[in-house]
Amino acid sequence: MKSFLEIYTLASQSVHQVLQADTLIEAPNWEPSGQSLLINGGGRLYRVPLDAPRMIPVDTGFAQSLNNDHGISPDGSLIVISNHRDRGSEMFLLPASGGEPRLISPDAPSWWHGWSPDGQTLAYVAARGGRRVIDVYTIGVNGGPETRLTQGEGHCDGPDYAPDGSQIYYNCDRDGHAQIWVMGADGSNQRKLFADDQVNWFPHPSPDGAHLLYLAYPTGTTGHPANLPVALCLANPDGTHRRRVLEFTGGQGTINVPCWSPDSSAFAY
């Protein structure tokens, strides 16, 4: 298997290959400094400096079974990871330089997806109370009670905050196949942003609020599998002016987590 870490620049509509690996690497986050990317592979976390691309291991202590749901705090001081243990996936925080993880999620399974712009709240998805579907939740960075935001039927996933923190974008299959939805950061005013025949996942608004990036699967796809023909699409934040900008083999692990450059000029995948 070969994996490719790439960057798409909006202005030039060009692709730059950062790294090629002979194993599976996934889910790039762009660090706030703009100088490196964070990726996962083989249950571990790696930092990739853009000036001299290579995979530098990040110390995650006992957490050695990471999935592709990880991210960096807005101020760059913390990393959140989702690590599999006996209860399933759990969320932990650790220093950005690495260190021993601190458990955040009071229950499991939990998968992180978004960080509020003020750095105080985490958005994630979880299965609770015997429900067979996944809902969107939030919790403070210091732990405490979790708040369930989605209540209806259907699988909801991939929550990510608007740059002003007022809204959360997510995908949900409540009305059939997965489409892009948006709601208030408190769970209010849940509504489908648009509908088409594609199976749409993992919406990510750009830091400047000008664009919405999402992953599109072929019609009829169930879940978010890997190794399918997919497209990365851009839209306006209100769901208008949708267009496909890249097509390749991918899916699970392509853009599960926020991947925009800090200046909104590019995204990694």
Predicted regions span which residues?
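Multi-bladed beta-propeller domains
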Residues: 7-24, 50-66, 94-109, 139-157, ...
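Beta-strand C-termini and the immediately following turn/loop, strongest in propeller blades
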Residues: 31-32, 37-43, 79-86, 115, ...
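Residue-level detector of Asp-centered blade-edge/turn motifs that repeat once per structural unit
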Residues: 32-33, 74-75, 117-118, 163-164, ...
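Solenoidal tandem-repeat scaffolds enriched in leucines and small polar residues
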Residues: 109-117, 121-162, 170-173
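Loop/turn-rich, solvent-exposed surfaces of beta-rich toroidal or solenoidal domains
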Residues: 197-233
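Blade-level signature of beta-propeller repeat domains, shared across WD40, Kelch, NHL, RCC1
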Residues: 251-269
